Amino acid sequence: MLMYKLMSEFHLEWGITLLTLNFSYFLFNSYQIKANWPLSYSTILVSLFVLLWLTFTTQSFILFYVFFECSLIPTIILILGWGYQPERLPASYYFLFYTLLSSLPLLFIIIAHTSIYSSSFLQFWGNFMDKMIFLLAILSFLVKLPVYFAHIWLPKAHVEAPVTGSMVLAAILLKLGGYGLYLVQVLNIYSETTLMGVCLMGGIFSCLICLRQSDVKSLIAYSSVAHMSFVILGMLMSCTYTNMSSILMMVSHGICSSGLFYLSYLFYARIWSRSFLLTRSMISLFPYLCFWWLSLSFLNMGLPPSLNFFSEMYFFIGAFSLDWMVVGLSGILCFLSSCYCIYLYSSTSHGESLYIFKLISMQLKGMYNRKSSSDSVTDFNFRLLL
């Protein structure tokens, strides 16, 4: 079948299965649930992973759509049930209506295709789509990734979701859009120069927005928009190198972004704030935690030999043979991505903290010293990250 050929080309089937197993093991072993209903929490996570596994392995496009949309339900329950702030309700509305309304054209296309060909398998889709239908079909995937101008729901959902919801959303749920875009794009070769321009300029604007953020979690959320712009751009170029670049970027972003969300939660659990004004000079209190923060920031900005580095290398190899303008704007996007990664690390780990915050930090340090008995605060942080 076509889907299995596509997955075997880049070993996606095994990679997705291992990624799901790794994240399920990580979530159930490293995160201690403090809610009143841990059984309900675990049930929601298990149901979410089952839906994701079914989405990535089904051959029928209509089943892919059903599982694709059903994965929204556990995520919204996580945001509503275990979010931190009252704003989680409008964030859930944004998440639901953006993703649901954008997927309606895809549903109508699937129904029309099934009525014409009496099949919803992917190998028949190549003869069915023209350019306009192709754009309507990928709209749902573009919003899910998301593309700039349809990204409003992502920062709201990330900021209001619990740490587990943010990690799963960044690591796997956003990749559903990239996976669907890849499956449709390899069947229909259309060079969408306008959409490519939107991705490039949207990625640059997202990087500039990141440099103006004062909330750690919000910055990480907007960085996802910038990285996903690279993914969409690579898919739309319809080149072997750029397709490989997009796949590597999605895997790398899933690891780095979820790790950064987890570390931001550890900061929040210690100082009860995500503001850059209150998270300065953290390296003096939590050096091991800042070491992992630095490592993930370097991986996120594409230093060799990270996956991001090889992803960008494949992208520029493919882009050089297509359009020099794309190469120039993509270089600016890579530079700005490095800038906000450096800003993210330096604003939290270094700098001069507020005087009153130093007093609070001393009290927090004493609390964690008592909590870890004879162990130091840094050893306690290191054990959490292992």
UniProtKB/Swiss-Prot annotation:
The keyword Coiled coil does not apply. It holds the Pfam family Proton_antipo_M. Its main location: mitochondrion. Keywords: Electron transport, Membrane, Mitochondrion, NAD, Respiratory chain, Translocase, Transmembrane, Transmembrane helix, Transport, Ubiquinone. Its EC number is 7.1.1.2. It is found in: Mitochondrion membrane. It is a multi-pass membrane protein. GO terms for cellular component: mitochondrial membrane. It catalyses: a ubiquinone + NADH + 5 H(+)(in) = a ubiquinol + NAD(+) + 4 H(+)(out). GO terms for biological process: ATP synthesis coupled electron transport; electron transport coupled proton transport. The chain crosses the membrane at residues 8-28, 37-57, 61-81, 91-111, 133-153, 167-187, 189-209, 219-239, 247-267, 283-303, 315-335. GO terms for molecular function: NADH dehydrogenase (ubiquinone) activity; ubiquinone binding. Belongs to the complex I subunit 4 family. Core subunit of the mitochondrial membrane respiratory chain NADH dehydrogenase (Complex I) that is believed to belong to the minimal assembly required for catalysis. Complex I functions in the transfer of electrons from NADH to the respiratory chain. The immediate electron acceptor for the enzyme is believed to be ubiquinone. This is NADH-ubiquinone oxidoreductase chain 4. It comes from Artemia franciscana.
